[in-house]
């Protein structure tokens, strides 16, 4: 697809998003809370199906762990934000003479990874709806189908609960160029980017607010006072979860000298390998 056609498609999505953005402004806190609850419950009802789709399409990860991530991104995230005030006056401090008023930022570009496609789509959709923001997704090309399925479930639930019909949109023909065009569109107000280093760097280079999440170098320090068996067990469980694709899983371990031999023996016993 050439750049002109890509830009035309992005422009159409953004124009639809503008209408939904204006419709969101008419909703009150109670209505927004009902919408977010409905979206969360819809994903919870389909968490196993979406996990299966993610593993089959991407050929990555572990089915049971994808289930856990879908439950976390729907149920846990919902309960962590459900009582937050996000509409109108959220703070009225008469003593210090100030008020805080919550307003949506507008249109969000949501970039999702191949490693956590369904759970990231759910999470970003929930926080966008909670804050009355329209989100347009640029899904990873290798996870398009499972990501679209998740977005459709969320959109249907949201609209039934009273949300604007285009509150969740996505690029139908995904590509790096299409995602970059979305992020750089002048009417996109915020970028939520989860992906590889290159994509996150691109998001930060767009000249607008961007929140990026990418691979991290996560160290773990095991002190001599630690329960070494528990520490090793936790490390192996964490690093092997969903075949180690979580950005926040441990990448390096620093161990006190007097624990080195015991640590290495327990790691090998747990099925780990030392490559150098």
Regions found by a protein language model. Give the residues of each.
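N-terminal Rossmann-like NAD(P)+-binding subdomain of aldehyde/semialdehyde dehydrogenases
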Residues: 1-99, 127
